[in-house]
């Protein structure tokens, strides 16, 4: 996990920000901190700002939108992801990935993509749930398939979703009026259009 943190930060041009509460749990969380420090030494080109997890939460409120990769243990990551998504505006605003690594090379070998939010029985049948997380999960999964077609489809989906949001076409949880089906159809329209244009351009 520590090695992937720095590999992903390098790939995305992000800063590694935060870390475990190693002052309380010197063995379990301390081991993770040691692995992060070792990975930082192997990747000196990646900016590294180690912080205790409580300070990470506090300082996130002061960040300026810079890309961050936040290493966290399971419970902390669960809390952190919900917190960040609420800052964005909706817990349905992002995908979640479970990655399996090659034990020797640390390369990603297995990927499972899902929506990080739970079920919402109160929204069932009302056509108002935000489908972003499920759509983005599909885009993320395509991004790990090693073909140009899959990567292009992944890019088209991401762009289609965020362009739709940027133009103010949102579901009610984000302050908009679009239904689940309307939002999904708008994203599909944009994805199809992008893929047709890119195909024509060669």
Where are these regions (language model features)?
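Glycine-rich phosphate/diphosphate-binding loop of Rossmann-like nucleotide-binding domains
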Residues: 1-52
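Predominant activation on well-ordered alpha-helical scaffold segments within soluble catalytic domains
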Residues: 3-6, 33-37, 132-143, 158, ...
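Short glycine-rich or small-residue beta-strand-to-loop segments that form or flank ligand, phosphate
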Residues: 15-22, 139-143, 173-174
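Short glycine/threonine-rich loop-to-helix capping motif typified by GTGT followed
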Residues: 26-36, 61-68, 85, 169-170, ...
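Short, conserved loop-to-beta-strand elements that form functional interface hotspots
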Residues: 47-59, 174-175
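A glycine- and small/hydrophobic-rich beta-loop-beta segment
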Residues: 53-67, 193-198
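Glycine-rich phosphate/nucleotide-binding loop
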Residues: 60-167
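Internal helix-turn-beta structural module
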Residues: 147-202
């Amino acid at each position: 996990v520590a090695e992937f943190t720095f590999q992903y930060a390098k790939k995305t041009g992000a800063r590694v920000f935060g870390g475990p509460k190693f002052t309380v749990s010197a063995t379990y969380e301390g081991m993770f901190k040691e692995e992060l420090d070792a990975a930082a030494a192997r990747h000196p080109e990646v900016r590294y700002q180690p912080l205790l997890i409580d300070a990470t939460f506090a300082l996130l409120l002061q960040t300026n939108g810079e890309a961050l990769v936040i290493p966290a243990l399971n419970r902390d990551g669960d809390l952190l992801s919900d917190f960040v998504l609420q800052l964005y505006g909706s817990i349905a605003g992002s995908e979640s990935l479970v990655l399996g690594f090659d034990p020797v090379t640390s390369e990603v070998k297995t990927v499972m993509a899902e929506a990080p939010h739970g079920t919402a029985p109160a929204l069932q049948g009302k056509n108002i749930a935000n489908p972003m997380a499920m759509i983005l999960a599909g885009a993320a999964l395509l991004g790990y398939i090693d073909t140009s077609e899959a990567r292009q489809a992944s890019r088209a989906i991401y762009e289609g979703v965020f362009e739709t949001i940027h133009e103010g076409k949102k579901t009610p949880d984000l302050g908009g009026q679009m239904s689940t089906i309307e939002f999904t159809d708008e994203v599909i329209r944009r994805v199809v259009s992008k893929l047709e244009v890119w195909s024509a351009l060669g």
